[in-house]
A protein has these predicted regions:
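A short glycine-rich, Lys/Arg-flanked "PGG" loop and its adjoining helix->strand segment in the class I
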Residues: 134-146
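Short beta->alpha hinge that forms the Motif I/post-I loop of the SAM-binding pocket
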Residues: 80-81, 132, 155
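N-terminal, positively charged/glycine-rich alpha-helical extensions of SAM-dependent methyltransferases
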Residues: 1-24
């Protein structure tokens, strides 16, 4: 995980560009399909706030944004550094006939939105890939309304030695 070290942006982008078509399958395998449940829980947390403007950072193939799109009256912006991941996301929303999500290529460390704009910001499995953790989180808080919620979904390396072995 990124512990505020500078990570090579180009390297991260290239990785996600190359795995975009397999990404969802890989998530199914690595989480034993639990990622779908965890992503739905983000939407459940968000619903309590009745948000109108939502930003999904590191949206990838759009799963979290799609779950959030079910919130009545909401408008979702999904951003990611990978054009190929966003192509998969756009294909999904077209097939599902979802029209309240807009995807764009954008770095978490340099968001293209005005200050205090979003009611909710979600980041699923993205914080670890920020090229600069502090800058990425500062940008998130810049565009989040003062009474808004930042919801982060991340995995960690388990402490149980038997399970930990599977992560190495």
């Amino acid at each position: 995980m990124n512990k505020n070290k500078s990570i090579d942006f180009v390297q991260i982008k290239n990785i996600f560009e190359s795995i975009s078509n397999e990404y969802d399958f890989m998530n199914d395998l690595m989480t034993l399909r639990n990622h779908s449940k965890w992503k739905k829980e983000i939407a459940e947390i968000a619903i309590a706030s009745s948000p109108k403007r939502i930003l999904d950072i590191a949206t990838g193939t759009g799963d979290i944004a799609i779950n959030l799109s079910k919130i009545n009256g909401s408008k979702i912006e999904g951003v990611d550094i990978s054009d190929n991941m966003l192509k998969v996301a756009r294909k999904k929303i077209k097939e599902l006939k979802i029209n309240n999500i807009n995807f764009k290529t954008c770095e978490a460390e340099n968001l293209v939105f005005e200050d205090n704009h979003f009611d909710i910001i979600s980041i699923g499995y993205g914080v670890r890939n920020f090229s600069n953790l502090e800058k990425g989180l500062n940008e998130s808080y810049r565009v989040l309304k003062k009474d808004g919620k930042l919801i982060i979904l991340e995995t960690s390396i388990p402490e149980n030695p038997i399970i930990k072995f599977l992560y190495t």
